[in-house]
Structure formats: structure tokens, C-alpha cells
């Protein structure tokens, strides 16, 4: 999957599916499910590493998880989902050179194809333009931006006229700077719907209504594995409960071999 395919999907009216992954197991599952894009998000700081925000996530951690995600795919490279990885906090806010080095490190040492960063401040736009000149595709992110949690909080954005006008202006600037798509997080659905028609690149929503060019979700939220479930991410599976019950059954079994006999294990089929 190439970034240009997503723009083509928008023109065709085809919905774009984006799911997160953080290791080889999760990426193999997401690939088998048919996701168009796999996002190695800095949300792994909360989902996997146990932090309360995304801010502590380091570039080394993002590289570690991105490499694991890329190793988990079964299909040939040309048929794999597009892999986008987040640039973590302070890897791009401190200047263009540092941003190029961070993005280059992620893409050079994995099979990821693009990076995502938050906001549309003048300094951020300069970073985006520099990255694109260096041949690194960039996905933007507006609305609720988790790396700005101490300034904006974890609450819905673009609720008043001024902030709505700003998000329209920012989306246009991200497009003009060269972004191939924009994530809109936790904004009113009617604003996202209008914004989708305002720009030519895909608008990927999360908590932004159903009328976007695509949707992105944290995979653990869909599977019901998260302890704290976001209000806009309805689980489609009681995954946490299922896992706990399965493990309890194994722990409480008087004959562990009978719970999962080796004969059945050897007959299991791989998705690859």
C-alpha cells in the first residue's frame, strides 16, 4: 500500500481503515483482518507500557515497536498495509534537523513508509515541509492532540466558532505543506464532515463522526482489552474478559494437558 492509494480511495469514495499495532502478534492479526493502514501509534505508551499519557514514549521505544510490527506481517511487502509511525513527543518540536533524524531513523530501520505528527503551528509546518523534501511522507493530526494533553486535556475540541475556523485553516495548511492525510480526533461530527469536503486529502476520523474518508481505532479498544475505554471507541469483543476466563480455565485445570492437548495444537493453521 502506498500513500497515493489513500488519495485515490478518497476520490473513489472507498472508506480507509486504520488500526494500531504494537508488536508482531498484533500486526499479523490486523493484517489478516484487512486493514489498509497500520499505525504504530505513541498510544502504545498507554496501551502497552502502562503510562498515563503518551509523553514518556521515546524514539528508541517507537523504533523497537515499529520494527516488531513490520516483522509480524505475512504478506509480501508490496501487499502489506501502509505502515505509519508516530513521531514521539520532543522528537520534532525541537527543530527540523532533529525531526529529520528521528523520522529517518524510524523509516531506515524498518519497512514503515510514513510518519505522523501533531498540530499545525508554524514550526510544525516547517518540519513537515522539510520531511517531505527529504522524501518522507507525513500524516497530520488535528483536534485532540495527545502530546498537548497538559495544554488541551483529553476532551472534545473544535466546540466553538473560533476553534472551528482554526481547524479548517490548519487542515488547509497541512494539505498545502504536503501531508497525504489528516487524522481528526474527538471533534464534532458535523465539523469533520464539512472539513472532509474542504480539502483534497483523506480525513481519517477517531471520535469525529461517521462521515470521514476513513476511521482509525486503537486495536485494543475494539477488542475490549483496554482497562479504560474511550467514549468514542465501542468494543466489538469482550476481549479482556475472554482472556481472563481462558487463563483461569488453564490455571484451575486439574490436568493442564487436557485443556489444550498437543494434538489440537499441531493441527492449528496459520494466517500466513
From Swiss-Prot:
A GO molecular-function descriptor:
magnesium ion binding
Q: In which pathway does it act?
A: Cofactor biosynthesis; (R)-pantothenate biosynthesis; (R)-pantoate from 3-methyl-2-oxobutanoate: step 1/2
Q: What cofactor does its activity depend on? A: Mg(2+)
- List its EC numbers: 2.1.2.11
Gene Ontology, cellular component aspect: cytoplasm
> How and how many cofactors are bound, per the record note?
Binds 1 Mg(2+) ion per subunit.
Q: Where does 3-methyl-2-oxobutanoate bind?
A: 42-43, 86, 116
| Subunit field text | Homodecamer; pentamer of dimers.
Tell me the protein family, please: Belongs to the PanB family.
Indicate what this protein is called per its UniProt record. 3-methyl-2-oxobutanoate hydroxymethyltransferase
What organism is listed for this UniProt entry? Prochlorococcus marinus (strain NATL2A)
Amino acid at each position: 500500500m502506498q500513500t497515493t492509494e489513500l488519495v485515490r480511495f478518497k476520490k473513489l469514495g472507498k472508506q480507509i481503515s486504520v488500526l494500531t499495532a504494537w508488536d508482531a502478534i498484533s500486526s499479523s492479526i490486523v493484517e489478516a483482518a484487512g486493514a489498509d493502514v497500520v499505525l504504530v501509534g505513541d498510544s502504545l505508551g498507554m496501551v502497552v507500557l502502562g503510562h498515563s499519557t503518551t509523553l514518556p514514549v521515546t524514539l528508541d521505544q517507537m523504533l523497537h515497536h515499529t520494527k516488531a510490527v513490520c516483522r509480524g506481517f505475512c504478506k509480501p511487502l508490496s501487499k502489506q498495509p501502509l505502515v505509519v509511525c508516530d513521531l514521539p513527543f520532543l522528537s520534532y518540536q525541537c527543530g527540523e534537523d532533529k525531526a529529520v533524524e528521528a523520522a529517518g531513523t524510524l523509516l531506515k530501520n524498518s519497512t514503515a513508509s510514513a510518519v505522523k505528527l501533531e498540530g499545525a503551528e508554524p514550526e510544525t509546518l516547517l518540519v513537515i515541509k522539510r520531511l517531505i523534501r527529504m522524501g518522507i511522507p507525513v500524516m497530520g493530526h488535528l483536534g485532540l492532540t495527545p502530546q498537548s494533553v497538559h495544554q488541551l486535556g483529553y476532551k472534545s475540541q473544535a466546540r466553538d466558532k473560533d476553534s472551528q475556523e482554526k481547524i479548517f485553516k490548519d487542515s488547509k495548511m497541512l494539505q498545502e505543506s504536503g501531508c497525504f492525510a489528516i487524522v481528526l480526533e474527538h471533534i464534532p461530527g458535523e465539523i469533520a464532515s464539512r472539513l472532509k469536503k474542504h480539502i483534497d486529502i483523506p480525513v481519517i476520523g477517531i471520535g469525529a463522526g461517521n462521515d470521514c474518508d476513513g476511521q482509525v481505532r486503537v486495536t485494543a479498544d475494539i477488542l475490549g482489552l483496554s482497562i479504560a475505554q474511550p467514549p468514542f471507541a465501542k468494543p466489538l469483543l469482550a476481549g479482556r474478559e475472554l482472556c481472563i476466563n481462558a487463563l483461569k480455565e488453564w490455571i484451575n485445570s486439574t490436568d493442564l494437558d487436557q485443556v489444550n492437548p498437543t494434538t489440537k495444537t499441531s493441527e492449528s493453521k496459520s494466517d500466513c
